[in-house]
Swiss-Prot record:
The lineage of its organism: Eukaryota, Metazoa, Chordata, Craniata, Vertebrata. It comes from Bos taurus (Bovine). Keywords: Cytokine, Glycoprotein, Secreted, Signal. This is Chemokine-like protein TAFA-5. GO terms for biological process: G protein-coupled receptor signaling pathway; negative regulation of vascular associated smooth muscle cell proliferation; negative regulation of vascular wound healing. Acts as a chemokine-like protein by regulating cell proliferation and migration through activation of G protein-coupled receptors (GPCRs), such as S1PR2 and FPR2. Stimulates chemotactic migration of macrophages mediated by the MAPK3/ERK1 and AKT1 pathway. Blocks TNFSF11/RANKL-induced osteoclast formation from macrophages by inhibiting up-regulation of osteoclast fusogenic and differentiation genes. Stimulation of macrophage migration and inhibition of osteoclast formation is mediated through the GPCR FPR2. GO terms for molecular function: cytokine activity; G protein-coupled receptor binding; receptor ligand activity. One of its GO terms (cellular component) is cytoplasm. It is found in: Secreted. Its main location: secreted. Belongs to the TAFA family. Residues 1-43 form the signal peptide. Pfam families: TAFA (PF12020). The gene is TAFA5.
Length: 132
């Protein structure tokens, strides 16, 4: 008597390797962890790129790109020489010194055309930042 089609062994059953449920659980957890870790907490920023050009004497040009996750009414800006989420009004009105962009002990002054600001250190060294 021939074996019944339901209980007989299939020849192609070994073509696919068996994967345990533990493997799939691990894969799902790993993908969730990767997705979660790439998210920034609300109201925080991180520096993505930082380039420095010191080819000119007595002058260093630095460019940085930041990624921010700002809350409603905030926008990416600078506080204490670090990227931060600041009140959008500051950016709209170009009152850059309201962000407190300079380090503690430095003085902040707007550039004449409001395209940026300067931070003056007690020793007289001046750092100029322009917004692009």
């Amino acid at each position: 008597m021939a074996p019944s089609p339901r209980t007989g062994s299939r020849q192609d059953a070994t073509a696919l390797p068996s994967m345990s449920s533990t493997f799939w659980a691990f894969m799902i957890l790993a993908s969730l962890l990767i997705a979660y870790c790439s998210q920034l907490a609300a109201g925080t920023c991180e520096i993505v790129t930082l380039d420095r050009d010191s080819s000119q004497p007595r002058r260093t040009i630095a460019r940085q790109t930041a990624r921010c996750a700002c809350r409603k009414g905030q926008i990416a800006g600078t506080t204490r020489a670090r990227p931060a989420c600041v009140d959008a009004r500051i950016i709209r009105t170009k009152q850059w010194c309201d962000m407190l962009p300079c380090l503690e002990g430095e003085g902040c002054d707007l550039l004449i055309n409001r395209s940026g600001w300067t931070c003056t250190q007690p020793g007289g060294r001046i750092k100029t930042t322009t917004v692009s």
